[in-house]
Amino acid sequence: MAGFGLPNFGQLTEAFKKAQEIQQNAQALQDELDGMEIEGKSADGRASVWLSGNQQPLRVRLDPELLSAGQETCEAATLEALQAAYEQSTATMKGRMEELTGGLNLNLPGMGG
């Protein structure tokens, strides 16, 4: 019997299947992001910071010459490298999430708008 304001069950079933698929792939994506090492460098290349795809800090490398350049220079270069790594890591995460959700536009927190 048609009507009664009920949704098309074929569409509802398809949406449910898509949600299940996303959920199943979410853990694999989490593991993939955790395993990534994304490097950010200072403008002069003397400081490098590595983050995972989930923005977890992994390691820092500072050129010995940078260390002798003074505290402010060293801090500025480290911050530049951290910002670059964060931007790349965030962009990677956002791109992978968009692939996972198939463009469903879920507007997830922390993923821009």
UniProtKB/Swiss-Prot annotation:
Annotated InterPro entries: YbaB-like_sf, YbaB/EbfC
Alphabetized UniProt keyword annotations: Cytoplasm, DNA-binding
Recorded GO CC terms: bacterial nucleoid; cytosol
Cell wall biogenesis/degradation among keywords: no
Source species, domain of life: Bacteria
A Pfam family assignment: YbaB_DNA_bd
Gene Ontology MF terms: DNA binding
Location in or out of the cell: Cytoplasm, Nucleoid
Family per similarity comment: Belongs to the YbaB/EbfC family.
Function statement: Binds to DNA and alters its conformation. May be involved in regulation of gene expression, nucleoid organization and DNA protection.
Subunit text: Homodimer.
Family matches, as HAMAP family: DNA_YbaB_EbfC
Protein name listed in UniProt: Nucleoid-associated protein SYNW0027
Organism, as annotated: Parasynechococcus marenigrum (strain WH8102)
